[in-house]
Amino acid sequence: MRSRKLAGGVRSSARLRARSCSAASASAQDTHVTTSAQTACQTPSSHKATDRRTSKKFKYDKGHIVKSELQKHRSDSAATPSETPGTHEPLASAEDGASLLGKEAGGSTPQGTAGPLPGRCGTESDASPAETENEPLPPRHGAPVGGESNGGCPARDGAALDLEQGPGAPLLMDGSALLDDDSNQPMPVSRFFGNVELMQDLPPVSSSCPSMSRREFRKMHFRAKDDEEDDADGAET
């Protein structure tokens, strides 16, 4: 009886140990499963957190770039009006220099010709204040070679008369001015006989018969007429 009880006790203790081991293994498996589930849940949350951080950084970088560009544009726009007055300074200095040169040229001229002359002379003297004394201007087209007239001004009428009286273009022999059908002018000869200049250069034609007077020509004409009448009468008879 005692041996059976001991055997039953040993068996019961072994069973308890096996149960405790199985429970421990089950609890270990449960803890492992829970830890794996927690890690699995934590990984997407960490990914989401990193994605949010990157998106925030990207948005911040974008906003920073846009702000920097706007600041650059503002600085450029603020710098441009400050540069514009500087561009007018050389023009103003050039105008001042031209006025000073004009004053110096006016002061160097004699007192007799200090005032501007009427007409075109005043404009010409004002337009050329920067002319040097050593370099004279070239003569203008149509101006007289002898110099200036009427107190230093080139005479327009004299130049026009010189142009009119001077050797003009050679006259054309085609008579293009006389081609109007409604006009009473005669037709040009060159339209029918070619170049008239070649015809004028030809020597005169020598007459084979000797020159006769007007009376002799009339006598011959009447004689020929009488002969024709006699021939006509003879033919009728």
UniProtKB/Swiss-Prot annotation:
Residue spans of biased composition, Polar residues class: 29-47
Q: Which family does it belong to?
A: Belongs to the UPF0688 family.
Q: Does the keyword rRNA processing apply?
A: no
Q: Where is the composition biased (Basic and acidic residues)?
A: 48-76
Is the Nucleus keyword given for this protein? yes
Compartment(s):
Nucleus
List every stretch annotated Disordered: 1-187
**Pfam families per the UniProt record, alphabetical:** UPF0688 (PF15772)
Cellular component terms (Gene Ontology): nucleus
Output the superkingdom of the source species.
Answer: Eukaryota
The Low complexity compositionally biased stretches are: 11-28
- The species this protein belongs to is Bos taurus
Ordered alphabetically, the record's keywords are: Nucleus, Phosphoprotein
Q: What is this protein called?
A: UPF0688 protein C1orf174 homolog
Residue(s) carrying Phosphoserine:
S183
